[in-house]
Amino acid sequence: MWNIYSKTSKGDNIPRLSMAVTIYHNPRCSKSRQALKLLNEAGVDVEIIEYLKHPPDAVTIDWILANLALQPRQLMRKGEARYCELELDNQDLDRNILIESMINNPILIERPIVISNDKVRLGRPPEAVLEII
């Protein structure tokens, strides 16, 4: 239902969806920027959380993992230097240690993550985020 209007950069009024949509966003990531652009083009009001500055807490990460049906390593960027430095490929590390590693080193969290009405999508590819709006 369209019930809110916003002005575009050109000054045009466009309808905005009134639903709670949150994106865990890294403005330096092309996939994250693409996902945010798709949400904006769809007319969705988006709460942007720059997760490198404001990382999610353990409860939030655990909730995201449960909703995506993923294990912690599946939400981690294994190509990041920090992943290797912390030896996070060690299979003896338990779930809590991996989640704590993401909190303390948010660069390890795969992005973007979009949450809408208790549904979660990882924006890989970016178009996947449109499935939940």
Q: What is each of the regions a protein language model found here?
A:
Residues M19-L38, A42, V46-I49:
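Local sequence-structure signature of Cys/Sec-based thiol-disulfide redox active-site neighborhoods
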Residues Y51-I133:
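Thiol/selenol-based redox catalytic cores and closely related redox-interacting motifs
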